[in-house]
């Protein structure tokens, strides 16, 4: 791997606008912002496309369509960087991502839309890993630290801009335009990255440090696909959920440090706790848009505000807790207890609101 370039410029506004490292860092942050916005875009658009296509019973399939390919290609990102020049690789993957988005926007039915999501997921998974590799290999230490710190802030901005963009464009021009209107910005950011890393190359020794976890990745993808593909009315739904969950847990046990899922005291228990908290939160978060649209009859704008509230709360609290970690046991217990109370109260309010609808 070529060594990270030395830079005589330290991070500053002038260097951000006028140096190679600054341009690359800015492009990385824009891509991070768009990745965050994509999460809210998918959630906002999901009930709209399902209603138009008469496919409300395929929420699980549509949601899994982009995630399953991403699980498969994420482990490949690093290996790809050692076989092809990063600039060419990122250009090819960006083209695939754009094609997937366009296919989804032009889809006449949910089957074609799922095909577009699969293409986009294949590209997005590899791009996520490749972008991190490019940041590590292509930026000096000071700029790398800046990107890592600012990346967290980008998710706060994404929580504000993502739902506003998705709901605004969907309400004004339709959900199909929402899937593609942001693409020129993405293409421009990726083009800047490709230009700034055109001379960057990684040798094959980088990819030999650790074997690609193919089997766990396949098990994870298969588990998520199985859960998402089965409809609730299918008699095999619950057996499929059980098998899919078992596959996901097994893949986690192979990837995570030994003892994590058994809650071995110490850092492993902390990782497991974080895993389960994220799983429960994201599960509820995926239900916000369909429930808001299908059950509560909210408009895209109102749904966007609901998604913004959760996203901003998550991002702001994460940054605040990261800046001031609870180092003492008492402070940690106090903080986690308060978080658990907020989580239970919020989830309870959501359930009561949905179940309180007469037709539900």
Identify the role of each PLM range.
Residues 50, 54-61, 149, 300-304, ...:
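Small-residue hotspots at the loop-to-helix junctions and early N-terminal turns
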Residues 51-53, 83, 134-139, 172, ...:
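Helix-to-coil boundary motifs at intracellular loop junctions of multi-pass secondary transporters
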Residues 30, 34, 46, 96-97, ...:
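Hydrophobic residues within membrane-embedded alpha-helical segments of Major Facilitator Superfamily
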Residues 71, 77-78, 82-207:
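Helix-loop-helix hairpins in multi-pass membrane proteins, especially solute transporters
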Residues 31, 62, 132, 150-154, ...:
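Hydrophobic alpha-helical segments of secondary membrane carriers
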Residues 1-18:
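Short, Lys/Arg-rich, polar N-terminal cytosolic tail immediately upstream
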Residues 171-275, 280, 285:
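Hydrophobic transmembrane-helix bundles of small-molecule transporters
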Residues 21-38, 42-44, 63-66, 71-76, ...:
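12-transmembrane solute porter fold
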């Amino acid at each position: 791997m070529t060594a990270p370039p030395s830079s005589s410029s330290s991070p500053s506004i002038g260097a951000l606008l006028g140096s190679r490292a600054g341009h690359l860092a800015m492009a990385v942050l824009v891509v991070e912002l768009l990745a965050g916005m994509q999460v809210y875009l998918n959630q906002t658009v999901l009930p709209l496309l399902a209603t138009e296509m008469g496919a409300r019973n395929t929420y699980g399939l549509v949601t899994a369509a982009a995630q399953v390919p991403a699980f498969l290609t994420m482990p490949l990102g690093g290996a790809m960087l050692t076989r092809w020049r990063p600039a060419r690789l990122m250009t090819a993957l960006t083209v695939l991502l754009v094609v997937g988005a366009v296919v989804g926007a032009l889809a006449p039915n949910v089957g074609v839309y799922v095909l577009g999501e699969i293409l986009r997921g294949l590209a997005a998974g590899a791009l996520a890993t490749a972008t991190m590799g490019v940041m590590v290999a292509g930026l000096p230490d000071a700029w790398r630290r800046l990107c890592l710190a600012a990346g967290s802030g980008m998710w706060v901005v994404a929580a504000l801009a993502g739902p506003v963009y998705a709901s605004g464009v969907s309400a004004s021009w339709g959900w199909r335009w929402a899937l593609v209107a942001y693409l020129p910005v993405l293409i421009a950011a990726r083009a800047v990255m490709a230009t700034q890393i055109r001379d960057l190359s990684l040798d094959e020794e980088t990819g030999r440090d650790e074997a690609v976890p193919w089997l766990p990745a396949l098990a994870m993808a298969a588990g998520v696909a199985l859960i998402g593909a089965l409809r609730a009315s299918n008699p095999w739904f619950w057996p499929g959920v059980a098998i899919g969950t078992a596959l996901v847990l097994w893949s986690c046990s192979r990837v995570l440090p030994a003892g994590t899922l058994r809650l071995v005291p110490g850092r492993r228990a902390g990782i497991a706790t974080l895993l389960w908290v994220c799983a429960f939160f994201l599960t509820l978060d995926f239900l916000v848009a369909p429930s808001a649209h299908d059950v509560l009859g909210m408009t895209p704008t109102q749904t966007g505000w609901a998604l913004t509230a959760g996203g901003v709360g998550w991002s702001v609290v994460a940054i605040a807790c990261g800046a001031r970690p609870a180092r003492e046991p008492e402070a940690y217990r106090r903080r986690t207890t308060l978080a658990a109370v907020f989580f239970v109260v919020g989830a309870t309010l959501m359930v009561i609101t949905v179940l309180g609808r007469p037709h539900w």
